[in-house]
């Protein structure tokens, strides 16, 4: 029986590997929504690092809103300056960058090194657009620490295990370092009394 929309949110939105189904048989629009949920990487706060990703986007939003109204941006009664913004921007851009680099590498190898792909047993059971979607979904799921997959992809090979491990480390642990650095920078700054027009 169908478990409804809540089942999709539990499977795709949580960042803790709690997937309970494989998604190769979903319709194209459903597959796109499943990927989008993981690529946003903060939907409903996620679990665990989802809150830290919210923190990154809040820093960016506070900085932009401060520029729009002509005030020095403040968050939690501390000034947000260029150093915090640079770190937050790098953290926000790292997630899609790692996903796209991994997908581009896999697509390049599939097209230009077919002997290597065949030596690993072949990867794609569904060539064409859906095959590209399977590769994109694999790296998206690794980067979002989700654990699901479009299982038409033969991903239990040396290449996929190593590349997905690298993507997981880069997209999970490097942002945590940046987010903790932002928290440390804000903690060192002087406390500013919160007023009605601050964004706290």
Question: What kind of region is each of these model predictions?
Answer:
Residues 149-156:
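Extracellular/luminal re-entrant pore-loop and selectivity-filter region at the outer mouth
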Residues 7-71, 86, 95-134, 141-148:
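Membrane-embedded translocation segments of transport machinery
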Residues 47, 89, 100, 165-174:
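Hydrophobic transmembrane alpha-helical segments of multi-pass transport and channel proteins
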Residues 106, 175-187:
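Membrane-helix cytosolic exit motif
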Residues 67-81, 182-196:
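Alpha-helical transmembrane segments
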Residues 17, 76, 136, 147, ...:
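Hydrophobic, well-ordered secondary-structure elements that form the walls
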């Amino acid at each position: 029986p169908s478990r409804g929309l809540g089942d999709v949110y539990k499977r795709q939105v949580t960042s803790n590997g709690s997937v309970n189904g494989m998604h190769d048989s979903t319709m194209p629009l459903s597959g796109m929504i499943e990927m989008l949920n993981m690529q946003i990487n903060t939907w409903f706060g996620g679990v665990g690092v989802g809150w830290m990703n919210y923190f990154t986007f809040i820093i960016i939003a506070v900085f932009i809103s401060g520029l729009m109204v002509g005030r020095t941006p403040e968050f939690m009664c501390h000034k947000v300056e260029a150093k915090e913004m640079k770190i937050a921007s790098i953290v926000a851009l790292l997630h899609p960058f790692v996903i796209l680099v991994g997908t581009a590498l896999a697509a390049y190898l599939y097209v230009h090194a077919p002997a290597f792909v065949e030596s690993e047993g072949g990867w794609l059971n569904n060539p064409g657009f859906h095959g590209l979607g399977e590769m994109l979904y694999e790296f998206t799921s690794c980067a979002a620490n989700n654990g699901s997959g479009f299982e038409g992809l033969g991903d239990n090979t040396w290449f996929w295990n190593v590349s997905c491990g690298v993507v997981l480390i880069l997209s999970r642990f490097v942002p945590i370092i940046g987010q903790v650095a932002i928290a440390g920078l804000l903690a060192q700054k002087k406390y500013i009394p919160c007023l009605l027009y601050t964004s706290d």
